[in-house]
Amino acid sequence: MIETCDVAIIGAGPAGANAGIMAASQGCHTIIIDEQAMPGGQIWRAKSEAIKSAPMTPEIIDGDKLRVSIAESNLTHIANARVWQIERELDEWVLHFIINGRSEKIGAKVLILATGAREYVQPTPGWTLPGVIGLAGATALMKRDLLTPGKRTVVSGTGPLVFFVASEIRRLGGEVAAIVTPNSRADWLRALPSMSYRIDLLRRGFVWVADLLLAGIPIFWRHAKKQIDGETKVQSVKVTKLGNDWSPKGPAHLLEADSVCLGHGLQAASEASQLLGIDVKYQLELGGWVPEVQEDGITKINGLFICGDGAGIRGAAAAEIQGKLAGLAAAKSIRPEVNSSNLALLNSYRRASRFGMAMTGLSIPRKGFQKLITQETIVCRCESLLRCDIENEIETGAATTNAVKSGSRAGMGPCGGKYCQSTIAKIIADRENQSEEKIAPPTPRPPLRPVSASALSGEFEYTDLQIPKPAPL
């Protein structure tokens, strides 16, 4: 027999944690499984236990409140666990996860997916050099360990995260060589009406930019990194001006640095929902391919709910509220007496979504941006495949990401295609003169996360193996 519960939740970020707290408050036996050591997700990531004290930030304050709420609730939090397979057995969900090097499983009547997002980083010549890190990875490093990516850093990318990362680097004592962003000042001005729904966050963003400008840090608007150079590590970055479609235009500028942070928006981590049979649709304003789900997390499959960035990139504030809505709806599906109607919560979710979607809109790369990916740029890091390798597959007839994967192994490495498949889809769309929404996402396959053979085999003695007798002569 395996342990069973009413509600199982994958992910303990703003969405998953609040879904769990809400479901538990309605009397449901609730279990949250999360990869991290502490709840909070990326946005509210906890400091390392080795750090005894640190200046308080809004993220630390909100994260600590969340962790206290979880500790005071009746839910069970399973930390440092990676879900690698989900199955449906009769009327119950069965979740297989790796913890302490072994595969365990639990059963649940209802499943809530709060799997969050992954960062899209467009490949650039030199992006595999030591010293290059994603914007999201840099925030994790700084929030958890209070460490800067390097001594002198170029921060490059789209949307608001470049300004947050640059501000945090300065706060922690690092040097920002420059900020390089494809966005223009006009892009930000056009987004202002939607950002007015969260004046507090808008004000905070203004403070970031003002502090950076007062510190004399150059901001290269409507620019992008063209190449990262160095023999064994980052030594310099070439940046170039962009046209309105973000294609390179004009001469390159050289910036000396020993580290680079780069990122180009977020995408819903929808592999688990697709694996379970949820249809996805292309919504550029939500980051690309997203699962079909209602505002309260309800899906077409009974007993399956999705919330947070895994349902579309609307930002942490919206994810927190949608988690509460999904937790209520999940509790209602088990305990009919639960009142799941909450108009005030729904209206708050819609307001927060407008702000988050405005930020997503600023983060989405435009069509000309991929011209920065040269033929000799590594696209698939796991298999060391270049853009020219991908285009060779397309020329032989591969018109989908699945076909490119079959012919080249792109996406078959440890990351499961999370680094390369979006870029490959963009390359296919460009070569076939199609819109990206015409290029279906790759078909997800188990395991959802890398899993070792030893974890699956469990503990056994070689003497227990049944060895057949030698065949008679």
Regions found by a protein language model. Name each.
Residues 1-408, 414, 418-473:
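Residues forming the flavin
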